Amino acid sequence: MPQRFLTLADVTDELNISAAQAYALVRSGELPAIQVGGRGQWRVEMSELEAYIQRMYAQTRQRIEAGDFDG
């Protein structure tokens, strides 16, 4: 059975970003997540990460089509 939820550490590995960047994505609401357990650890549903990646592809495509290669 595939893993449904990812830790922020998993997200950093998947996206090759820092822990601070992953936390900022969650805090801003750009990457939906939930807090679980007594220590409030963040979990990101795999489908939400995939949706985020698809949104980033779409944004990148739009920038390229607009001639904005510097992002």
Describe every region a protein language model picked out.
Residues Q3, Q21, Q35, Q41, ...:
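Residue-identity detector for glutamine
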Residues S28, R43, A66-D68:
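Intrinsically disordered, low-complexity regulatory regions of eukaryotic regulatory proteins
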Residues A9, G29, M46-S47:
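Structural detector for helix-capping/boundary residues
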Residues M1-A22, R55:
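Polyanion-binding surface elements
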